[in-house]
Each structure stands twice: as C-alpha cells, then as structure tokens.
Amino acid sequence: MPDYIDTRHHKMAAGCASVNLDGFMMSEGHIKDLYARYTSNADVAVTEGVMGLFDGYDAMRGSSAEISGLLRIPIVLVVNAKSTAYSVAPLLYGFRNFRKDLNVVGAVFNFVASESHYSFLRQACEDAGVEALGYLPKCADVEIP
C-alpha cells in the first residue's frame, strides 16, 4: 500500500516532486510513464519501497520487488542489525536469490553497535554475495520512539 504522506516528505527533503508508483492502482504502462517523466532530468532517482521487498496485495503483486523488476531499478536492502550479526547472511542470500531477475546491489545496516559489530555484518555480506555499502550506528539521539 502506498503511503501518500511520504511524497510530501520526499519533496521537502529533495526539493523536487515525488510520486507514488502503485502496482495495485496503476497499469504497468502508467508506472513506466510516471517513472520516465519524473526521472528524465535527474542524475539520481531514489525509489523507496513499502513494507518488505516482496510484500504486495496478493503475494508479490504490487510489491516493491514487482516495481523494481518492471523498471529495472537496482535494490539496496536496508537491514535492521539491532539484535543480529552474522545471522543476516542467509537473509541476504535469500533476498539476492529469491528472484534472480532482480538486481540486489548491496545492503546498508542500521542500529550497528560498533565497528566490530559491522565487521560481522560485512563478513555476512561477503559470504552471501551482497556488497556491504555501509551502516548507521546505534544512536539514541536520532531514534524515533
């Protein structure tokens, strides 16, 4: 389900228009046209997914994975590392291999406790065949209650 409030937040942050790409409400052609129109003059387009990558209104129908596949958008996984370390390896492996037509380019971790913690996460990425792109440290000052 798209979050219609997010587009306003995106516009404030990016300084340009933001739209929803809704696989339930829009045809594939309309999604492609919207994406082409709103990214035609952009150097970079950040496309935020909703819920989990493969969650849609009917299994994967309307999911972020479906939109990514349709538009050939590379995927950066954002992984909560709060209570895990090397155990993310099979999770990453599964996301990379569940649909071979998708382009999972890497992972960013949040809630990382230390550089040592991140070293386990980097090793998990390496063993799962997913690039570790970085992390956001655990920081009470920026947590949302």
Where are the regions a protein language model picked out?
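C-terminal lobe/tail of nucleotide-utilizing enzymes
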Residues: 97-145
